[in-house]
Amino acid sequence: MPMILGYWNVRGLTHPIRMLLEYTDSSYDEKRYTMGDAPDFDRSQWLNEKFKLGLDFPNLPYLIDGSHKITQSNAILRYLARKHHLDGETEEERIRADIVENQVMDTRMQLIMLCYNPDFEKQKPEFLKTIPEKMKLYSEFLGKRPWFAGDKVTYVDFLAYDILDQYRMFEPKCLDAFPNLRDFLARFEGLKKISAYMKSSRYIATPIFSKMAHWSNK
C-alpha cells in the first residue's frame, strides 16, 4: 500500500520529503490541501480532517506508512532516511548530519519570519546583508566534500539543497562567491531520480510559502 504524504499545495516544509521519496523510488500518494484566498485564508480543507487521521500531534506535513503515522517534517525525513540507510554510516557522518539538519531549520526560520512579516519590505534590506555570512558558513562546512555528511548522499543533502535553493531564489547572486555550494546544487539536481522528478508535473518549485506570505517567489 502506498504511503500517504499530506501537506498544503505549496513547496514549504515538504520539499525535502517529496524529493527523498522520489530519490528512494518510494510508493506514495499525496494529499494536497488548498488554502483559501485573502482575507480569510480559509483552511477548512485541512481543519475538517485534522483530528480524524489518528495523528498524535495533528499537523502538516504528515506521513502515513501502514501503522506508522508521523508528523514533524524532520521526523518524517529521519524515518525515511533510516528506512533507506541514508542517515550516515559513521559517527562522524551522523554528527555532521545532525548539525546540518538543525542549522538548516534555523536558516529556514529566519527567511520565514521575514517573508511573513507585515514589515517585509522595510526589513528586507537588512536581511539581505546577513545572507553572505550564512552562505559562508555553509560553504566552509561543506568544504571539498561532495555531500554535507561526507562522501555519500544522506537525508540532510535534501534539506541543504532546499534551503540553499530558496535563498538563491530570494537573492540570485548570493552563491556567486561560493563555487562549492553552486557545485553542490548542480550535483544534487544531476541525480537521476531528482532530475526526472524536477521535470515531472508532480514537482512544486514554487510557491515556496502559503498565500499569507509577503514573498513566495510565485
Swiss-Prot record:
Positions annotated to bind substrate: Y116
All copies of domain GST N-terminal, residue ranges: 2-88
GO cellular component, one term: myelin sheath
Residues bearing PTM Phosphoserine: S67, S210
Top-rank taxon: Eukaryota
Subcellular location per the Swiss-Prot or TrEMBL entry: Cytoplasm
Signal peptide: none
Documented EC number(s): 2.5.1.18
Residues that coordinate or bind glutathione: Y7, W8, R43, S44, Q45, W46, K50, N59, L60, Q72, S73
Record-linked CDD domains: GST_C_Mu, GST_N_Mu
Residue span, GST C-terminal domain: 90-208
SUPFAM superfamilies xrefs: GST C-terminal domain-like (SSF47616), Thioredoxin-like (SSF52833)
Phosphothreonine sites (modified residues): T34
Quaternary context: Homodimer.
Role: Conjugation of reduced glutathione to a wide number of exogenous and endogenous hydrophobic electrophiles. Involved in the formation of glutathione conjugates of both prostaglandin A2 (PGA2) and prostaglandin J2 (PGJ2). Participates in the formation of novel hepoxilin regioisomers.
Family indicated by similarity: Belongs to the GST superfamily. Mu family.
This protein's name: Glutathione S-transferase Mu 1
Source organism: Mus musculus (Mouse)
